Amino acid sequence: SIGIISSNYFSNPSSKLKLIGITGTNGKTTIATLLYNLYNTAGLKAGLISTVINYIDGKEIGSTQTTPDSLTINKLLHQMVKEGIQYCFMEVSSHGIEQRRISGLEFAGGIFSNLTHDHLDYHNSFDQYRDVKKDFFDNLPNTAFSLVNKDDKNGKYMVQNTKSKIFTYGLKTYADYKIKILESSLEGMLLKINESEFWSNLSGKFNAYNLLAIFSTATILGMPFSETLQLMSMLKNVKGRFEYLRLNNITAIVDYAHTPDALKNIINSINEIKTNKESLITIIGCGGDRDKSKRPVMGDIASSLSSKVIFTSDNPRNESPETIIQDMVSGVKPLNSVKTISIANRKEAIKTACQLAKSNDIILIAGKGHEKFQEINNKKHLFDDYKVVKECLTKMN
């Protein structure tokens, strides 16, 4: 295959460093990026291959797809080996596995975060999507490790045929690595691993899972316990992932949540943290020309769990924004419909949320996260959720 040819052409760079692949529906970017940041801060030479950005020892190289093609990957890895990189953390998407973009790569470890409804427009069925992810673990060598989230029922399935050494992590079940949330606020969490407590700048239960995956990986790779905890307390949010801004007594959170599960996770995390006095205003859209079955589900989740919802455009691509919004609205239960409004223009939707917000309210802008563009009718328009909401809240004075 082209993967093996590419590997050979660059003289198998993946075998000359420790390549760790991270797969799952949610958490890939956070786990990969924060592992890279952790190792970088520790003074170890590390590389990152992710949706948001590629890094080689602190130098940035642009990125668009979760898993680039095999030629690009091997070229990046070859460059990393030349620069003396010891560890590379890489997001592995199901598209990347199925299109054999990672064939010929030698992984030192694989991490499974969770599996939920995502990319079903591409994979046809959940079972097919799950089996593609499992394929990654089936192909790990016996020199590698796999680390799976034991609280996800698919975790066990992922590693049932792997030759790698299996480790598990979880909050609920008995696992090799466990974490406990002691306190939680929008500013961060007080966590406990083994008998040691540490503070993290990350919020939300889903981030406790991400941090535990990071801790477990560092431990498996031989980093001392106290050093790992110290480095973990220094980690900051990844851009566009639970990105937090407080201006004029209003909190805005920008997050990439674009699957039903990710949306539910982030709203539940905010609801667990806030008192009953503040309202949560959620702004949400769904991408055009993509899996339509998730639209009513996301409409239902947003309207059931938020105080107010503004349905708007995400990346409508070649579909009519109004049609996409209608699909989302169709999932709203009658008793929740009073909480919802629809504003197709995303900038207007954000502006309206800022006007509706009272002191101490929380605005969640979901779906696009770190993205700098909005795709409308085959054209990319500059658009940054964080910048737009910051501008709106600043003007409110």
Enumerate the language-model features and the residues they cover.
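Glycine/Thr-rich phosphate-binding loops of Rossmann-like dinucleotide-binding domains
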Residues: 2, 98-100, 120-121, 156-157, ...
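Phosphate-binding loop of NTP-binding sites
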Residues: 2-150, 154-163, 212, 218, ...
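Cofactor-binding loop segments of dinucleotide-utilizing enzymes, especially the Rossmann-like FAD-
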Residues: 25, 51, 149, 171, ...
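Hydrophobic anchor at the start of a short beta-strand
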Residues: 46, 87-88, 166, 280, ...
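Structural signal for short hydrophobic segments within the conserved structured cores
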Residues: 47, 167, 177, 196, ...
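Short acidic loop-to-helix transition motifs that present clustered carboxylates
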Residues: 94-97, 153, 173-175, 236-237, ...
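Adenine nucleotide phosphate-binding catalytic loops in nucleotide-utilizing enzymes
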Residues: 123-130, 134, 160-264
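ATP-dependent carboxylate-amine ligase
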Residues: 213-226, 230-240, 244-397
